[in-house]
Amino acid sequence: MDKCSVGGLELTEQTPALLGNMAMATSLMDIGDSFGHPACPLVSRSRNSPVEDDDDVVFIESIQPPSVSAPAIADQRNFILASSKNEKPQGNYSVIPPPSRDLASQKGNISETIVIDDEEDIETNGGAEKNSSCFIEWGLPGTKNKTKDLDFSTSSLSRSKTKTGVRPFNPGRMNVAGDLFQNGEFATHHSPDSWISQSASFPRNQKQPGVDSLSPVALLRKQNFQPTAQQQLTNPAKITCANCKKPLQKGQTAYQRKGSAHLFCCTTCLSSFSHKRTQNTRSVICKKFASTKKADVVLPVESSRSFQEFCSTSCVSPCENNRNLKKGVFNKSRCTICSKLAEIRHEVSVNNVTHKLCSNHCFNKYRLANGLIMNCCEHCGEYMPSKSTGNNILVIGGQQKRFCCQSCINEYKQMMETKSKKLTASENRKRNAVREENEKQFCGLSSTLLKKIDGITEKKEKTSELHLSVECGTDTLLIKENVNLPPSSASAIADTFQEQLEEKNFEDSIVPVVLSADPGTWPRILNIKQRDTLVENVPPQVRNFNFPKDNTGRKFSETYYTRILPNGEKTTRSWLLYSTSKDSVFCLYCRLFGEGKNQLKNENGCKDWQHLSHILSKHEESEMHINNSVKYSKLKSDLKKNKAIDAAERRLYENEKNDGALLLYT
């Protein structure tokens, strides 16, 4: 029996009977002769590390094994087709199929199943890919390698990647003659990406460069499939199902509804996602449920990025009204001057303390109290940004007063004229009353003097006729003393009495008003005239004085008269007075207009030198001090106006008097 050894294969004359096909044996013999030496095996075996599977969509074909009627197969002389599970072919790999006559019966028994495998890395050694071996053994009865049943492995057949009706490219399948075989017939290669599903793309199995295969398949023409540049640059992004949020694996079929951007893993998720129950939202005002499909009214919430939903426009109006009320309450604040809760129009920051003023009137009071020099109209108090805005200046009593417009000047003039008329009428009435009283007193005094003079003359005539006697010596002496007054001196006596009376009245009005500059000597309660004189004539501050020390060794210093502002500017505290008699300090504004038992406004003053700086800073920022300073400034301005009016009246009176004298002489 002739034997031909090809690598690990032994071919005998009985081999055709075993295979049942002489043509297949002949072709195998030719392939064996082409190598020429047993050292060149038919199939290369590699015992290196395995190569993991791809995570492709694998289409598994369930094929019934063909029935072979040869007696050799009945005697368990079988043809074995084995393939490793971890097989990765290099280039165009080949699988020897059953005879063509059996393939026709297999087409009707093919079923399709989608399997998703996990992707594993390919282990390499020295840059060369290591492949598992796929070999064919044919043995005779009684030999070392026994025959086995025909084994169609699912893992080996799954690599064929065939699908009925789609006709994808099936790399490496060939017939015995060496031609490419596809789906049971001879066909040419299709595009390498024609088998990829629409939902995902998979990397192709390519042969690593530099690795040579010793299999007969390596002698065939090889096709290297290179991925495109776009596939090399872009990395696959993680995509999840829109319904169940499960990640879609590589190669998994995804479902998408037309016109929608959502992807789903299965039809169940697709149908359940489209029929989800709409979320109901509760209206903010009426607390009714409103479906999100309806055209709800959505408004943003203040001071946040959230939104509020309303069932209709009727619920929006009460919400807006509440917002407006809250805005109005928040915008209102308490005025520093009048202490009213109103809308603030002016804000003044002094020493990092913001004073809020509700109106122009309160602003003018605050401005006068703190000595703020601003461009404001004297009549309406409107602020003028620059001095060049208004050229309406009125000079009254040597002082320039600015106005915003001509109408304010006219109104101010009318107001001053009415005040002057009222003052002149009252002054005339007062003067007339004083004159009448003086005339009455003078008339009464003159009548009494005349009566005395008449009685004296009558007595003189009687005494001239009588003789002198001792009994009436005293009477005659008295009469002589009275008679010694000349009758022409009556008018002089009346004039001197009038002068003395006027001086007495003047002293009565002046003596209690005159006060010393020491606030410690002032009475506890000041009357109106005393307060006016102190406002007109401000007491001087004590300087260049040797201030005494107290028990702790502390004393008053002139540095307390100066206040340092936050910007470094220095201002004088003109309201702070030092009493040498009581060794204490007083607040002039609070001493004149204040009430209560504050240290700086009572009759004893403040002498806490250790905490004086803190007391002064706290006191000058208090509301009581600011109000008293406003009253002081207002009274001072009123007294100046009255003086100006009195001076004008005197000038008018003198002019009228001079005019009357001139008329008399003409």
Swiss-Prot record:
Keyword rRNA-binding belongs to the record: no
Positions of MYM-type zinc fingers: 262-296, 308-348, 355-390, 401-428
Biased composition (Polar residues): 194-208
Cross-linked residues, Glycyl lysine isopeptide (Lys-Gly) (interchain with G-Cter in SUMO2): K85, K88, K146, K163, K222, K440, K452, K459, K549
TM spans (from-to): none
Compartments it resides in: Nucleus
Chief place of localization: nucleus
GO CC terms, sorted: nucleus
Keywords: Isopeptide bond, Metal-binding, Nucleus, Repeat, Transcription, Transcription regulation, Ubl conjugation, Zinc, Zinc-finger
UniProt-recorded Gene Ontology molecular function terms: zinc ion binding
Region annotation (Disordered) ranges: 87-106, 191-212
Listed SUPFAM superfamilies: Glucocorticoid receptor-like (DNA-binding domain) (SSF57716)
Domain of life of the organism encoding this protein: Eukaryota
InterPro entries (alphabetical): TRASH_dom (IPR011017), Znf_MYM (IPR010507), ZnF_MYMT-QRICH1 (IPR051284)
Subunit: Interacts (via N-terminal 120 amino acid region) with ETV5 (via C-terminal).
Summary of the function given for this chain in its UniProt record: Functions as a transcriptional regulator.
This protein's name: Zinc finger MYM-type protein 5
Organism: Macaca fascicularis (Crab-eating macaque)
